Amino acid sequence: MTMITDSLAVVLQRRDWENPGVTQLNRLAAHPPFASWRNSEEARTDRPSQQLRSLNGEWRFAWFPAPEAVPESWLECDLPEADTVVVPSNWQMHGYDAPIYTNVTYPITVNPPFVPTENPTGCYSLTFNVDESWLQEGQTRIIFDGVNSAFHLWCNGRWVGYGQDSRLPSEFDLSAFLRAGENRLAVMVLRWSDGSYLEDQDMWRMSGIFRDVSLLHKPTTQISDFHVATRFNDDFSRAVLEAEVQMCGELRDYLRVTVSLWQGETQVASGTAPFGGEIIDERGGYADRVTLRLNVENPKLWSAEIPNLYRAVVELHTADGTLIEAEACDVGFREVRIENGLLLLNGKPLLIRGVNRHEHHPLHGQVMDEQTMVQDILLMKQNNFNAVRCSHYPNHPLWYTLCDRYGLYVVDEANIETHGMVPMNRLTDDPRWLPAMSERVTRMVQRDRNHPSVIIWSLGNESGHGANHDALYRWIKSVDPSRPVQYEGGGADTTATDIICPMYARVDEDQPFPAVPKWSIKKWLSLPGETRPLILCEYAHAMGNSLGGFAKYWQAFRQYPRLQGGFVWDWVDQSLIKYDENGNPWSAYGGDFGDTPNDRQFCMNGLVFADRTPHPALTEAKHQQQFFQFRLSGQTIEVTSEYLFRHSDNELLHWMVALDGKPLASGEVPLDVAPQGKQLIELPELPQPESAGQLWLTVRVVQPNATAWSEAGHISAWQQWRLAENLSVTLPAASHAIPHLTTSEMDFCIELGNKRWQFNRQSGFLSQMWIGDKKQLLTPLRDQFTRAPLDNDIGVSEATRIDPNAWVERWKAAGHYQAEAALLQCTADTLADAVLITTAHAWQHQGKTLFISRKTYRIDGSGQMAITVDVEVASDTPHPARIGLNCQLAQVAERVNWLGLGPQENYPDRLTAACFDRWDLPLSDMYTPYVFPSENGLRCGTRELNYGPHQWRGDFQFNISRYSQQQLMETSHRHLLHAEEGTWLNIDGFHMGIGGDDSWSPSVSAEFQLSAGRYHYQLVWCQK
């Protein structure tokens, strides 16, 4: 044990937080989570241990701008200015200094290992009592599961130790410091330490005791570590559970270890042995260790699909059977290996349906509770995710237990990121930083290696490639050869990774960056000598309205076996709740706390909002990742299961044939598909509709029974095919009514019954419509070529740093947002049964024509207005965001009804999950409340739209809401939007894709850009 003087002054003088060689003082060795049961039955059933006591709750807290400002008296008693805060928590969420959001840039001046003298410091204290029996015998430990970023600990005025690495436990022996009666803990937490240079992750920078604190009482002679692993024969019919147990304390000949394996209440195997390890070298073996091997016949294998778990109980006892203590863990029998270029689980090639997950809560910051963790897992499972990457640090220890039990594959990642260094490997190639890096990797492995859900270790994130990585890679491979290691830094395919694990590599497009090229994922596989599997550690940047082109990745994954999936970036928007002057909550992002530097809304890349409400993109991910694939041939549906281990024992296939959303026939067939098997389903003779319309076949896989992660009726997969389009020629009903045209100097006015249409001859636009005496328009019907920029359109561009390559900057520079219409033609003709208005406009900016739009409006005796639009795009202007029409309707109706793709928001490059049907939703549901407002709510493939008294027919895309594109473009946060008068309608003949391969470079694939020179579309507008 390191002994230093107890005084605060000496601790401050040492400045351990600016010494990369000092990562801890007096911290105990890492190990799996302990409970020290004194009853083996309680260990087997995982009941709360009487030896484990939570210290979570109210602590006293005082904040200081720097550690030097902390008075020495605080070690002995609480300060007058001390407040009460809840532990665990981040102190910024209680109003003490500010959270800082940055992606790459360090939030402090880069001068490792030194940190600013203005180093916010939180002083926590707690008084508590311990059981008298704990003082008389054994060892009492205190466990801090997570403290950001470094801390010193005192107990009863005496210095205990020091710890850093905010994402792994720091555990100390308190036995020598405790006394009878009341005890007092004092914890001085520093916001910045040399460890902060290794924690430059893309997240909010927050501080404090943000994970659980507990006391653990162990006997003097105790289990100090245990490690379980499973081995198999070739066909997995026989297994061996290897359990290596280590003890500390007085080694006696009468000590024994028993390891028993349980399946529920049934003991599967058991073994007992004295201590004394196998011979290691010429000096012998470990006297304080023993390895037991238990044979298991026909083990039930663990996978994310079927997370079968056993329970291993490790007992330390005397020769006569007297129990000293027991530890336990869940055991999953599974094997991970790479063979023939494939990542295999239990001999089957995995397809990783993964997502990156930060630990984030909108109210509690980086504090995770069990309810939120379970909610995340259920949502992931319900949306066909089978894997999660702990980005970019070891998670709360409970997370792994839950992943074991519910079934998720985990990439466990070391808390190392030096993204803001230039070059990135400045620290990771420096031997002075090897001890700090080593502790972050080795302690992660020692804590988490008993979890079957952990199938891959990661050396960290975005830290370049240095010699320290190579050393730690070799250490892991030596200590735990049962799992592969991945690491993206330095090019994603270095010697420090078993898996090619790029981030944001594209399917077919190379990105030849100097030194670290990102090849297309297809090309990467074929590089000379390359035999490893490829799994994208990050892809499909889901920032705001994004995930365009996701289907392209999944086509490639299913086509090329060594492309074994990836991890979407990322799971949850990292917005935080703030309150306005009236106490109303709103969602904040970088800069909203006065934090500098900051990276604005770049913290919001989630498939779900911070409150776990899904983004529309989540449905696209669910559909592309679904475990059942379908092929239609004639009357036969071929269903293919992508489950590797699960037989379809809880699935029904519902099928329905509908004509323009009207059901004509339906049925239900139980699915009986073996893992990786197929089932052919013969449909009956389908009805032949007599009326016109599109005939669609829709299949949905429904789970009739609830599961551990889904309710009864859960839909896990679906597909839709258009069978036919019945065409009919319907002659207009004979009408003696003929629209009447009136011409004035200013307008063309057409009247028919109680309806009127007014075209302004000076502007050439439809300026007003009346039904009776009620005006229908608040703004004219005009061409529209722009959209409120998406995050993907903006990229890295900002006011102080313009990226001319970003779509929005190209559109601005070309004048798309500022273009004004010059009237070229506006004429009216009376036909035999209709009035025809013909217009032409040149949309210009600074004298340059960007678009020419020609329209005809044909208003017939039935009151229908048929609109035909032809648009020419200048060859030297950027591809436009949309080609469509826009107006502000006077009505605000409660509901929107349409025949087209839905129900969720969809875009041309993100619509595979949408189904063609007749949909009816509240107007409010047509708007997607992205925290950073942008273009949203589009519905593609629309043949009919009904809103209020109006109906539109044709083949178009639309969005409709209370917010104009202008307001969306000019507003920084969704809570600042105000419902405008009437309703804004955008009807597009064509709309550019949204992209999403990444969010900092133009990522809309060429096939989804509006690159043609001419466009033509038609629609009919009438009143019901």
From Swiss-Prot:
Textual note on the cofactor: Binds 2 magnesium ions per monomer. Can also use manganese. Binds 1 sodium ion per monomer.
GO biological process: lactose catabolic process
Residues the entry annotates as binding Na(+): D202, F602, N605
Cysteine pairings via disulfide bonds: none
Result after altering D202F: Obliterates all binding and catalysis
Residue positions binding Mg(2+) 1: E417, H419, E462
Induction: By allolactose.
Binding-site list for substrate: N103, D202, E462, E538, Y539, A540, H541, N605, W1000
Highest taxon of the lineage: Bacteria
EC number: 3.2.1.23
Listed name of the protein: Beta-galactosidase
Organism: Escherichia coli (strain K12)
Lineage of the organism: Bacteria, Pseudomonadati, Pseudomonadota, Gammaproteobacteria, Enterobacterales
Gene coding for it: lacZ
